[in-house]
A protein has these predicted regions:
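Active-site- or binding-pocket-proximal scaffold segments within functional domains
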Residues: 1-325
Length: 325
């Protein structure tokens, strides 16, 4: 009995846990479902001697497990109770882990494999640019940098009031954030939207220039995005699995589900060629800007959901990465 095992995100974490169940001498949870008493198995079938793992294909492992019963509420730290992510040397004939170079959400920390024993490659894109899930075309409307609260400005936002607001640290931070996003290639063919939200002042005392109040500064982005970048990682994983003898058909180049858009093909070819040589592609700044403007989604953002920010970026926009354990 030979296994080829695949998974994306928490599914990749589940795949890694499953590998460890298969490798247990007694078959772990599998022994109660696959055993010699079943019609498909010969009577001499023994789990430990008649099972093996051929290929393990992982897309950007994000275990992200909390345990509220133990007061462990964070899904972004290294603790993942109840799941065995460790992939030992020799656990399979081949382990390939494709990771997202541009993911940096607080709740989407990366759980690496041991690259001394297994193949781990970094590909351009965020989490679902590798594992899939984005439509071919979608509209992306996101609140980018964290909203800046400027206290004690003036309610009218005109004349001297506006000049004071523009001289504030919050305003300058928003300008710097916009410049950094533009340097990455955003907003592509879309647009940035700057908003100044006047908050109702707590104190209505009169001044010579109007009522004092706080202002919330926001930077949003509205654009159309393409979803076909995930087909690059699909092709790489498919080719790696075929090399290891996984029973897959050859991809049909004319099948619209797998085809790569013409404009993406030069970068895709570069990434795929490097990956098949066991290397992570090094892209030029112009190539990165093109991808960020058209294909790499802004997964890290400050859009609120039910009063929470599930997709907020990690500090300094750097992803937390945890070694195999």
């Amino acid at each position: 009995l030979k296994f080829d095992i695949f998974g994306f995100s928490r599914g990749a974490a589940a795949a890694r846990h499953f590998v460890n169940e298969v490798l247990r001498v007694d078959g772990g949870v599998m022994s109660g479902h696959l055993h010699h008493a079943l019609p498909a198995f010969v009577s001499e079938f023994e789990w430990s001697s008649h099972t093996s793992i051929n290929f393990v294909g992982l897309f950007d492992t994000v275990a992200a497990i909390a345990d509220p019963a133990q007061a462990h509420l964070s899904v972004g730290d290294a603790k993942n109770p109840g799941v065995n992510l460790s992939l030992a040397q020799g656990c399979a004939n081949k382990v390939v882990h494709l990771t997202a170079a541009d993911e940096h959400r607080h709740n989407f920390s990366l759980n690496r494999v041991n690259s001394e024993y297994h193949e781990e490659l970094v590909l351009p894109g965020v989490h679902s640019n590798l594992g899939g899930g984005y439509p071919s075309v979608s509209r992306e409307r996101v609140l980018l940098g964290r909203p800046k609260l400027v206290r004690g400005n003036y309610y009218s936002l005109t004349g001297l009031d506006s000049a004071r607001l523009q001289a504030s640290n919050g305003w300058q931070q928003r300008e710097a954030a916009e410049a950094a996003f533009r340097a990455k290639g955003l907003p592509g063919n879309g647009r940035f939207i700057k908003q100044e939200l006047k908050l109702q002042p707590n104190n209505h005392r009169a001044t010579g220039q109007g009522s004092e109040g706080d202002v919330l500064l926001m930077l949003s982005m509205d654009r159309l995005m393409r979803g076909e970048l995930s087909r690059v990682s699909l092709r790489i994983m498919h080719a790696k699995a075929l090399e290891s003898g996984a029973p897959f058909d050859i991809l049909n180049e004319h099948d619209s589900r797998f085809s790569i858009p013409t404009d993406l093909q030069p970068i895709a070819s570069k990434v795929i060629t490097a990956a098949m040589a066991g290397k992570s592609a090094v892209l030029s700044n112009s190539e990165k800007r093109y991808l960020h403007g058209r294909y790499i989604h802004a997964s890290a953002n400050w859009n609120a959901q039910w009063g929470f920010f599930p997709n907020k970026p990690r500090a300094d926009n750097q992803r937390a990465i945890y070694d195999d354990q």
